[in-house]
């Protein structure tokens, strides 16, 4: 691995690596790999590709969490207008300079809760990919935040939420899925198949059943097991 840059981040040192053989780049922060992006900006992680496929039907997409910007880049390339919010301004600089995120992708320096409270616009597609070292998903995606996400969702819209799990027994995705289900949304839990010790779970929530066949097909194609939350 070749080191391209180092930054001082709020959670610790940020290092950008490049694989000499492939040109793919990694975003490493305080001992945690945050992003893996293929040369040119395409998503290198299956969960990001899953989120991109699920959200791709929206003409306007709101994303929380920047990282390497691969999700925003994929959706922008598909013709969507994309707005990314992140409370760490350096994330946008890193995504554009080192991970090929287009300048046409809109950026807003704010945290998710503040954005949801202060904005009134609705969006047909909302993606949540926030996290980092010692991140508390239960605190950030509490009942109030899930209710606000629902309010910002346009009719027939879809929400995709990524949760990085520490173990196969991690029950965080189920708890947050239950909170979204309480907002009168149909919720699917998509997990790595089979779930490994450290894995990603993607929650997909929408307000009608027309998407269900698409969700299961996309999950199967990318190696995820999807089941509906009752």
Model-assigned labels for residue ranges:
Residues 108-111, 191, 226:
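Short loop/edge segments at beta-strand edges and connector loops
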Residues 113-119, 140-144, 184, 210-224:
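A short, terminal or domain-edge coil/loop segment
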Residues 78, 98-99, 183, 222, ...:
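Residues at alpha-helix termini
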Residues 6, 21, 42-158, 167-177, ...:
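The AdoMet/dcAdoMet-binding core of the Class I SAM-like
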Residues 171-192:
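Conserved Class I S-adenosyl-L-methionine
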Residues 1-41, 46-49, 53, 178, ...:
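SAM/dcSAM-binding transferase cores
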Residues 10, 101-103, 183:
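Short, structurally constrained coil/turn elements
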């Amino acid at each position: 691995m070749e080191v391209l840059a180092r930054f001082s981040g709020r959670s610790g040192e940020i290092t950008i690596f490049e694989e000499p053989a492939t040109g793919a780049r990694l975003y490493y922060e305080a001992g945690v790999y945050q992003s893996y992006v293929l040369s040119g900006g395409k998503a290198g992680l299956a969960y990001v590709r899953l989120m991109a496929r699920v959200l791709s039907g929206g003409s306007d997409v709101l994303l929380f969490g920047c990282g390497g910007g691969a999700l925003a880049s994929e959706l922008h390339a598909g013709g969507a207008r994309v707005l990314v919010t992140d409370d760490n301004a350096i994330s946008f600089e890193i995504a554009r300079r080192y991970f090929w995120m287009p300048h046409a992708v809109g950026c807003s320096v704010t945290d998710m809760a503040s954005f949801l409270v202060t904005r009134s616009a609705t969006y047909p597609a909302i993606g949540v990919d926030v996290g980092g070292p010692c991140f508390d998903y239960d605190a950030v995606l509490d009942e109030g935040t899930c209710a606000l996400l629902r309010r910002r969702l346009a009719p027939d819209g879809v929400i995709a939420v990524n949760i990085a799990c520490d173990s196969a027994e991690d029950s965080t995705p189920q708890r947050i899925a239950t909170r979204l289900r309480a907002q009168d949304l149909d919720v699917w839990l998509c997990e790595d198949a089979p779930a490994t010790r450290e894995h990603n779970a993607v929650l997909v929530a929408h307000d009608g059943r027309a998407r269900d066949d698409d969700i299961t097909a996309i999950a199967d194609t990318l190696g995820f097991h999807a089941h509906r939350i009752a």
